[in-house]
Design a protein with these regions (language model features):
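N-terminal intrinsically disordered/low-complexity leader segments
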Residues: 1-29, 165, 213-224
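Hydrophobic alpha-helical segments that form the core
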Residues: 2-10, 164-185, 196-208
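Generic hydrophobic, amphipathic alpha-helix propensity
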Residues: 30-38, 55, 80-84, 88-91, ...
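Helix-turn-helix
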Residues: 33, 37, 41-75, 79
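Amphipathic alpha-helical packing segments from all-alpha helical-bundle domains
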Residues: 86-89, 135-159, 169-174, 196-199, ...
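Amphipathic alpha-helical segments used for helix-helix packing
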Residues: 115-137, 151-155, 181-188
Length: 224
């Protein structure tokens, strides 16, 4: 007690705990941070299982910041999906530039597996169904785009071998679908190594094509 006034050193302003300061970022840096956090959460929990609150908390910001950059969870998800689709499409189509058809098949199969290995979260997002994906693009639509390019390659090969080039779209869908489904399986098992998986895919696809019958028939009798 001093001069009738109680002195409490514990209430000194210098002793009060300080709150952690929010890291200052530019608009572009904050947007990228939110995209990275959203990408991770969408891969782990899916679109429905992820909330704006959780995204904001992970970023250390308030919910309005997420809305300011993307308009909401749907907008953020759409941007994430679009970026992953571009990444995968660029990788696979870049492998279909030039070379012998077998080499092109090898390169395309390896490119898909390489994407899965390098961008696992992105691939999980692409293959997971979401209502939002219906308007932003789906894995099925991406595979269809790739099949269209494979169709052109097969069309030339069919002409050279005397097969009907009108059937190229059917075979293109079958080939790309085979590689895509195998990729989804390999996403979880990761065995054998991607080079070996690609080799086996090409082995089945190429030797199957190499031994094609010009007019295949079903062994059993079918009316339709």
């Amino acid at each position: 007690m001093m001069g009738g006034v109680a002195i409490d050193g514990g209430n000194s302003s210098s002793d009060k705990p300080r709150r952690g300061r929010r890291v200052r970022m530019t608009g572009a840096e904050r947007r990228q941070q939110l995209l990275d956090i959203g990408r991770t959460l969408f891969a782990e929990k899916g679109f429905e299982g992820t909330s704006v609150e959780e995204i904001a908390a992970k970023a250390g910001v308030s919910k309005p910041v997420v809305y300011e950059h993307f308009g909401g969870k749907e907008g953020l998800y759409a941007v994430v999906v679009d970026r992953e689709m571009r990444q995968l499409l660029d990788g696979v189509t870049g492998a279909l530039t030039a070379g012998h058809p077998r080499e092109l098949l090898e390169q395309a199969a390896f490119a898909l597996l390489d994407y899965i290995e390098s961008y696992t979260d992105g691939f999980r997002i692409l293959v997971r169904d979401s209502p939002v994906a219906q308007s932003t693009g789906t894995f099925a639509s991406l595979i269809s785009d790739i099949a269209t390019q494979v169709e052109d390659i097969l069309g030339l090969e069919f002409k050279a071998r005397g097969f009907d080039p009108k059937l190229a779209p059917l075979y293109a869908q079958a080939l790309v679908g085979m590689v895509a489904l195998t990729g989804q399986w390999w996403l979880d098992v990761r065995k054998p190594k991607k080079a070996e998986v690609a080799a086996h895919l090409v082995n089945l696809a190429w030797h199957g094509l190499d031994g094609l019958e010009s007019k295949p028939q079903l062994v059993g009798r079918r009316k339709n």
